[in-house]
């Protein structure tokens, strides 16, 4: 089999990895092999955590809504059930924001849910 000289493409590939590893500590930003491992791991964590972030924020919104709902005398599950019955389509992100920034507006939504629960 003939020898393959990769020319500038090999350097391009290595430089791409080293550029991604910029700012890493020690050999991980200097040596190609160490940098490759570090970058692969970092990209895997980034991929995983983009999905985990969605779960974490949904849990945070639910916690905030539950706290505000209990101040208004209703549990989270009854609030959501009442809103579904009333055909109110407000997502959890908006409701959590309302609960924090506009308690009166949130109380109106709660009263709507209580009427239809």
From Swiss-Prot:
Keywords from UniProt, A to Z, are:
Ribonucleoprotein, Ribosomal protein, RNA-binding, rRNA-binding
The gene name on file is: rplT
For this protein, the record's InterPro entries field holds:
Ribosomal_bL20, RIBOSOMAL_L20_CS, Ribosomal_protein_bL20_C
Q: What GO molecular functions are on record for this protein?
A: rRNA binding; structural constituent of ribosome
Q: Which organism is it from?
A: Geotalea daltonii (strain DSM 22248 / JCM 15807 / FRC-32) (Geobacter daltonii)
Recorded GO CC terms: ribonucleoprotein complex; ribosome
* Family assignment from sequence similarity: Belongs to the bacterial ribosomal protein bL20 family.
* Matching Gene3D superfamilies: 6.10.160.10, Ribosomal protein L20
Membrane-spanning intervals of the chain: none
Looking up SUPFAM superfamilies in the UniProt record yields: Ribosomal protein L20
From the Swiss-Prot or TrEMBL record, give the protein name.
Large ribosomal subunit protein bL20
User: What is a biological process (GO) this protein takes part in?
Assistant: translation
Q: What does this protein do?
A: Binds directly to 23S ribosomal RNA and is necessary for the in vitro assembly process of the 50S ribosomal subunit. It is not involved in the protein synthesizing functions of that subunit.
Q: Has UniProt tagged this entry with the keyword Ribonucleoprotein?
A: yes
């Amino acid at each position: 089999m003939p020898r393959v000289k990769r020319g500038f493409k090999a350097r391009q590939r290595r430089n791409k990895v080293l550029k991604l590893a910029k700012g890493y500590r020690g050999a991980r930003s200097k040596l190609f092999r160490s940098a490759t491992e570090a970058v692969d791991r970092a990209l895997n964590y980034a991929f995983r955590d983009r999905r985990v972030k969605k779960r974490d924020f949904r849990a945070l919104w639910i916690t905030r809504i539950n706290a505000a709902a209990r101040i208004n005398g209703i549990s989270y599950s009854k609030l959501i059930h009442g809103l579904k019955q009333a055909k109110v389509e407000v997502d959890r992100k908006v409701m959590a924001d309302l609960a924090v920034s506009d308690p009166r507006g949130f109380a109106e939504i709660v009263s709507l849910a209580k009427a239809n629960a």
